[in-house]
Amino acid sequence: MRPLDDSPLARDGKVLILAYDHGLEHGPVDFEPRPATMDPETVFETATHDAVTATAVQKGVAEAFYPSYEDDVTLLAKVNGTSNLWMGEHDSAVNWSVDYAKELGADAIGF
C-alpha cells in the first residue's frame, strides 16, 4: 500500500471524496431530501470546492460531465455497480474498464 500523501485523492494528508455513485445503486429515492443533488452539474460544481479532494461517479456521469471539470475535479471512477431494483443476490457487475476510465482521465478507480 502506498502512503496517503502519494495518492491523487489526498491533499495535505487528508481525503474527502464526494460520492455520487450511489444513484445507480439506490435509485432516485436517495435524492428526495435534496432534489438539487440529483443534478450532476450541481455535484460537479460542489466538487470544485477546496475541501473536496475527489468525486466518485459512474461511467455515464463521468462521460457526460467530467470533461468540463477535468482541470478542477479529481475523478474516482466507480467501475462497478448494482441496483436495488430486484430482489435476491445483487450482482455488482463491472460496467466499464480500467483502461477506459484511465482514457477518460480518471485519477483513481473504485470498485
Q: Model regions: which residues?
A:
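N-terminal basic/disordered segments at the start of proteins
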Residues: 1-12, 16
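Alpha/beta enzyme core
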Residues: 15-17, 21-55, 60-111
